[in-house]
Amino acid sequence: MAEPEERSLDDFFAKRDKKKKKDKGGSGSAAGSRGPARPSDGATSSSLSSYVSAAGKGVKKEKSGKSENPDQLQEKEEDEWKEFEQKEVDYSGLRLQSLQISNEKEDDENENKEEQGADWEESGGFGSDKSSGPWNKTAQAQAPISAVEEAPEPVHTGGVYRPPGARASVTTRKPQGPPEIYSDTQFPSPQATAKHTESRREKEMEKTFEIVKHKNRASNEAAKNPAPRPQLDNQYAVLGEQ
């Protein structure tokens, strides 16, 4: 168990050392590309002159690179934006002159209409149409026609409008009084039918019975016409004697 742990630790440290070496090599190459190392304070004149010449060469290279880049960009832009020149085509063989003439006429007519509309607005709507056409010809003066005078209709002031069918049959209505609340004809009810039947029965009963209005008059009539007396004797007594 101890051996694999030691191997894994060794591998880990070996990988870390490799990474450090790579980082150091990359930083050194970047420093070389930036330019020559700056000499120390105690350097000789020859080392200083070599440092200055190397720095000047680096500046010239950067300038030349910068000067070349805009030319390349301009060339690329010219390649991308190419002007398209349309070729002129001869349409004389297609006989399009008639179409062009008709279009010109329509344009002229539209311009005339716009001018006439402006004149009409300025004149307050009473401008005359100056364009030529059959609708602008002045009509010939016709002979004056004798106007037939019609009899004026009588003017009715006030009143209520009535249709012609109702005008002929006009009936005068009598003034009506207030409605009778207790009348069965104007205000019918379910009880009215029952009362009607009772009134018929009362009339039939009146025919059989006499109505006494005066006391003395009824007694006088009874004295004049005496009622027949009933026979109280036994009619079968004769049979008993035999």
UniProtKB/Swiss-Prot annotation:
Signal listed as a keyword: no
Segments of skewed composition (Acidic residues): 105-122
Entry-linked InterPro entries: CDV3 (IPR026806)
Compartments reported by the entry: Cytoplasm
UniProt keyword annotation of Manganese present: no
Residue ranges with Low complexity bias: 30-57
Superkingdom, natural source: Eukaryota
GO cellular component, as recorded: cytoplasm
Biased composition (Polar residues): 129-143, 183-194
Main location group: cytoplasm
Residues modified as N-acetylalanine: 2
Record field: compositional bias (Basic and acidic residues): 1-15, 59-75, 195-213
Pfam (any one): CDV3
Record keywords: Acetylation, Cytoplasm
Region feature (Disordered): 1-242
Similarity remark: Belongs to the CDV3 family.
Protein name, entry field: Protein CDV3 homolog B
Organism: Xenopus laevis
